[in-house]
Amino acid sequence: MNQIQVFISGLILLLPGAVDSYVEVKGVVGHPVTLPCTYSTYRGITTTCWGRGQCPSSACQNTLIWTNGHRVTYQKSSRYNLKGHISEGDVSLTIENSVESDSGLYCCRVEIPGWFNDQKVTFSLQVKPEIPTRPPTRPTTTRPTATGRPTTISTRSTHVPTSIRVSTSTPPTSTHTWTHKPEPTTFCPHETTAEVTGIPSHTPTDWNGTVTSSGDTWSNHTEAIPPGKPQKNPTKGFYVGICIAALLLLLLVSTVAITRYILMKRKSASLSVVAFRVSKIEALQNAAVVHSRAEDNIYIVEDRP
């Protein structure tokens, strides 16, 4: 009877070891992942190994890294590191730049002196690709650029949105139809609001100065935003500067041409005056010579008998 009790007690003690239990760890592709493994050093520092697959009866199969308790003595790849305090019992394995092929079972085996005293922990690693996240979209707001007197803008819907509610209970089904007819909206630069309620579906608008947003399924709100200050156009200023420079250059050329024309005219006028004076002097000299010759002829005629 006592032997049967001892046998049953032994089976109960061995039963947990016969069931495989894994510690699940998840990682992301391209990021480091750490498999935690520690042991108590109150009995002293001992050797530890990491391997791929389940822990065998002794040592590690497909060894990745090995430590003697003070430092790493074997390292299969630079991607496998022990970044904890090894001498304090922290032998956690860190896999750098993890990939999907790193997924699988890993064994951390701490060798403790004695029969079947080794500390064995099996990890199940799952490395999945990173899921891209999209930033939330925000509704855009358009501001009208035209300013001045108020203008009237009317909108016309191309369809009549309807909503049908059907009851699946025993009473007869009921149908509710919502109809929206847009009314002309007066748009002012300083205060303009237009509200539309009772629209079951989203109704976009294409005219400037309004933004349509739907908070839920059964109501829409259309709001017109007053125009802001018109933005300056640098291209327009550039063209204005070019036009001013061209006008200044044309004015300078015209001034030079007019000045030169006036100087040439004055020079030609002075030359004509000098020529006129010279011709006048020559005429006077010729007249004097003719007059003297006439007097000589008179004297000659008078001397004859």
Curated annotation (Swiss-Prot):
Glycans are attached at N208. It is found in: Cell membrane. It comes from the Eukaryota. Gene3D superfamilies: Immunoglobulins. Pfam families: V-set (PF07686). Residues 22-237 are extracellular. Residues 1-21 form the signal peptide. Disruption phenotype: Mutant show progressive loss of IL10 production in B-cells and with age develop severe multiorgan tissue inflammation. Mucin-domain deletion mice exhibit decreased phosphatidylserine binding and are also unable to produce IL10 in response to apoptotic cells. Specific deletion on B-cells results in spontaneous systemic autoimmunity. Residues 139-152, 161-177 have a biased composition (Low complexity). Disulfide bonds join C37-C108, C49-C60, C55-C107. Residues 22-122 form the Ig-like V-type domain. CDD domains: IgV_TIM-3_like. Expressed by stimulated T-cells. Expressed during primary antigen stimulation. Expressed at higher levels on B rather than T-cells, both constitutively and after activation. The chain crosses the membrane at residues 238-258. Possesses an immunoglobulin V-like domxain, a mucin domain, a single transmembrane region, and a cytoplasmic tail containing a tyrosine phosphorylation motif. Interacts with STAM. Interacts with SELPLG. Belongs to the T-cell and airway phenotype regulator (Tapr) locus, a single chromosomal region that confers reduced T-helper type 2 responsiveness and protects against airway hyperactivity (AHR), the hallmark of human asthma. Belongs to the immunoglobulin superfamily. TIM family. Phosphatidylserine receptor that plays an important functional role in regulatory B-cells homeostasis including generation, expansion and suppressor functions. As P-selectin/SELPLG ligand, plays a specialized role in activated but not naive T-cell trafficking during inflammatory responses. Controls thereby T-cell accumulation in the inflamed central nervous system (CNS) and the induction of autoimmune disease. Also regulates expression of various anti-inflammatory cytokines and co-inhibitory ligands including IL10. Acts as a regulator of T-cell proliferation. This is Hepatitis A virus cellular receptor 1 homolog. It comes from Mus musculus.
